[in-house]
Amino acid sequence: MPRNLIVITGSSGVGKSTLARALQEALLPDQWLHFSVDSIFYCLPLSIVERVDQQNDHAIVDSKAIVAAAFACATTLLELGHKIIFDLVILSETGAQGLMRALGDFDPLLVELTCSWNEIRERTLARGDRTLAEAEHGYRLAGGHLQPHCAFDSTGTSAVDIAAQLVARLHSGTRAA
């Protein structure tokens, strides 16, 4: 059965979404949808999104419901035959277990993306869509909760180069890092 799910994990600012977009292009003519927890989060009213992102105020949203909705949407898309590149931050063992409960039956290729703190700091400041405190929180807690098939450090490697390596692994059937 051909693989139809790639899951990219890592802290905020490591380049998960950038890698997902590069993979979409590299995997053409196959059409892969990029989906994430943020796909649901950014459906919220702008004032709530800005409060969460700029003030680091997560108390105003039901994060568990947003994650569950993202998993449910991804599951539906996969069941309908779509190919998905799903990216998310996993901060705990519980989060990793939730991901695998929701999407594990689809035999995902698990990709872990890391990056140096200095690079994440620069990227976060350049983006301006979240606080450094949130980025640092993710940097400290993300990673190590899943055993990835492939792991990459995006500090000095472009998303296009990482995507090319992943595509080569997908085409060769190689799963191990």
What is the meaning of each model-derived region?
Residues 21-71:
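Conserved substrate/cofactor phosphate-moiety recognition/catalytic segment
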Residues 61-107:
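Glycine-rich phosphate-binding loop used to anchor ATP phosphates in small-molecule kinases
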Residues 11:
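P-loop (Walker A) phosphate-binding loop of NTP-binding proteins
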Residues 8:
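Hydrophobic anchor at the beta1->P-loop junction of P-loop NTPases
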Residues 17:
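Walker A/P-loop
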